[in-house]
């Protein structure tokens, strides 16, 4: 009898036959595990609870994902990639706008991507608290990828070379770090897009304040980080 891809025998112990789950089903289980870890953290989440929520045996869970630590690491990596994919979609949906309005939309999108259902950053927050070295590496990679997305959008949408270079050098590195950190904080406080919208809009206003200052200030007379900190104090 021909078995389906998700029903292929994997291993046998006693009377139990392990069956290899399809890639789609494995991704569904990782999403379920993500919700469990996001609610309780790594230490307080048991593999029994994850298996029960997923509707599979604990043995099958371990057979596919290994130890709880390995599963948590996969969840954190997947969460970061989901957030980046969601951010790309958000950027793609931004209409043609003047540079400063585009920056405002990008800042809001970066913040709100952290509190959306897809890619919610709560599990990343737990990772940074409970598995710092691993999660920090994933987070740094996400920062770099997000900076690249910002620079690509600015390069595509801003025809003026002066505007592009000023923003890429003096705004993007600081704005991305700040927006992602703020989004992470909102996710930790259990905000959803509806409740985070006003906070994101206000914070994006600070980023626009900085961008305007950068574009209007003579070369060599400002520092992006100090300018952003000053703007944050003024809108607080």
Predicted segments, located by residue:
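Amphipathic alpha-helical interaction segments
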Residues: 28, 105, 123-126, 166-174, ...
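Amphipathic alpha-helical segments used for helix-helix packing
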Residues: 115-137, 182-189
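Short alpha-helix boundary/capping elements
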Residues: 69, 80, 115-118, 132-133, ...
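Amphipathic alpha-helical packing segments from all-alpha helical-bundle domains
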Residues: 84-85, 101, 132-159, 166-167, ...
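C-terminal peripheral helix-coil segments that are non-catalytic and often amphipathic
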Residues: 1-12, 112, 147-160, 171-236
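Short, basic, alpha-helical segments at the C-terminal edge of helix-turn-helix-like DNA-binding modules
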Residues: 47, 77-83
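Hydrophobic alpha-helical connector segments
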Residues: 74, 88-116, 158, 165-169
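Helix-turn-helix
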Residues: 28, 32, 36-70, 74
């Amino acid at each position: 009898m021909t078995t389906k891809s998700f029903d292929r025998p994997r291993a046998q112990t006693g009377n139990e036959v392990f069956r290899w789950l399809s890639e789609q089903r494995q991704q569904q289980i990782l999403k379920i595990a993500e919700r469990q870890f996001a609610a309780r953290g790594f230490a307080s989440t048991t593999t029994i609870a994850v298996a029960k929520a997923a509707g599979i045996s604990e043995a099958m869970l371990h057979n596919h994902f290994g130890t709880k630590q390995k599963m948590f690491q996969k969840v954190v990596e997947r969460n970061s990639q989901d957030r980046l994919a969601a951010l790309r979609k958000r950027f793609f949906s931004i209409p043609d706008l003047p540079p400063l309005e585009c920056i405002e939309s990008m800042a809001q999108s970066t913040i709100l991507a952290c509190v959306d259902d897809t890619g919610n950053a709560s599990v990343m927050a737990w990772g940074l608290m409970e598995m710092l070295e691993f999660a920090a590496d994933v987070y740094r990679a996400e920062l770099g990828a997000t900076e690249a997305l910002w620079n690509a959008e600015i390069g595509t949408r801003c025809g003026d070379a002066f505007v592009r270079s000023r923003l890429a050098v003096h705004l993007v590195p600081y704005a991305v770090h700040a927006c992602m950190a703020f989004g992470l904080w909102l996710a930790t406080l259990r905000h959803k897009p509806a409740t985070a919208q006003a906070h994101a809009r206000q914070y994006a206003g600070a980023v626009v304040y900085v961008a305007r200052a950068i574009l209007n200030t003579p070369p060599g007379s400002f520092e992006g980080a100090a300018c952003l900190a000053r703007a944050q104090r003024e809108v607080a």
